[in-house]
A protein has these predicted regions:
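Surface-exposed cap/linker segments adjacent to membranes
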Residues: 1, 24-27
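The feature captures the LRR N-terminal capping module
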Residues: 1-19
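A generic local structural motif
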Residues: 5-6, 33-37, 112, 127-128
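Structural signature of tandem-repeat unit edges
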Residues: 16-25, 42-56, 66-79, 89-102, ...
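Extended Gly/Ser/Thr-rich low-complexity repeat segments
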Residues: 27-44
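Short active-site-adjacent helix-start/loop capping segments
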Residues: 29-30, 56-59
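Consensus positions within tandem repeat domains that build extended binding/scaffold surfaces
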Residues: 38, 58-61, 81-86, 104-109, ...
């Protein structure tokens, strides 16, 4: 299954449950109750792979993909939108790439299985609610110094 949306193409491999996003620039934003192009296969998505060239993950892009366990993000990514991975209840750990600058409010809200997050030195702004209601989150690794954090 393949589809193109503005500057972004997506494809889904049913055997692996992998949704691959390719393109350049910013991903579209969606409203909280607006259907994304992959809405019909949302419950089958086990892995999201965003390729080099993409600079953002749009608002609500992968919201409520409850089978999503793995996310691969490129070093070209600089922005994670509001609710971008909200309600991804099977997601266990996230390594944010060097290059990301902004993580918006509730980007990982209610990711109840999320245990570990790695934050890069490039991070400039993280909303205090980015990981709200992630009760299992017990490990946050920052790859910079204390002075860089402040």
């Amino acid at each position: 299954m393949n589809e193109k949306l503005n500057n972004v193409e997506w494809s889904f491999t049913q055997e692996t449950g992998c949704l691959t996003i390719t393109g350049t620039g910013k991903m579209q934003n969606w409203a909280e109750h607006q259907e994304r192009p992959w809405e019909e296969i949302r419950d089958e998505i086990r892995r999201v792979r965003i390729c080099v060239g993409m600079e953002s993950v749009g608002d609500c892009a992968f919201q409520n993909c409850t089978s999503l366990k793995e996310v691969e993000l490129p070093e070209t990514l600089v922005y994670l939108g509001v609710y971008s991975f909200r309600g991804c209840t099977a997601l266990r750990d996230v390594k944010l790439p060097e290059g990301i600058c902004i993580i918006c409010a509730k980007a990982f809200h209610n990711c109840s299985a999320l245990e570990k997050v790695e934050l890069p030195v490039s991070l400039k702004n993280i909303d205090m609610r980015a990981f709200a209601k992630d009760e299992a989150l017990h490990t946050v690794i920052y790859h910079g110094t204390e002075a860089q954090w402040e």
